[in-house]
């Protein structure tokens, strides 16, 4: 999923605003420390690198314009390597060791499923661009915010196109092995069935990111 300049600026602004809700006040001339969990390497880096470009641009423009209330923004970056375990380790270091005011990321739902509960326990504000519906919950995760559509919203648009525009009545749904892939299949299949489509094949976790070969599934 790509990110526009406007989205990046909005996300950075929202993250910084959220940081004032939970963390203690610090000196007015100190930079605002923003923890950042992009996937710069690994299978999700094709998305992570694009989001990183937008995020870096947003910070540069905010700082060049005088910062936030006169304070510069400092990104403290930890590459998740597209790995939920490394994402959790990075989040723990940022919220405890680095004492950041807010965390932006991870950029992958599978990683966020592991990170969101951890940051909620430390009352660290978080903004992420991940789609799995359960990744924002006002009761469980009151300091977690999303700057992207949910699986329900994406699924509604995609399924409408498949059933109403393409007029397909038999549909196969497959996913990768990530938490995002499993959650997506579990969300989209009932939505397709509700629109009258027959799901002839449901394949949860049939391939890993970066290794998909469509031939066997197409033949089946």
Please place each PLM-identified region on the residue numbering.
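N-terminal secretory signal peptides and thylakoid transit peptides that target proteins
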Residues: 1-16, 20
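C-terminal segment of N-terminal export signals and the immediately downstream linker at the start
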Residues: 22-40
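Extracytoplasmic "Venus flytrap"
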Residues: 35-54, 78-84, 107-108, 174-183
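Envelope-exposed proteins and targeting segments
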Residues: 30-33, 71, 143
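Short, well-structured alpha-helical segments in soluble
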Residues: 84-99, 161, 213-220
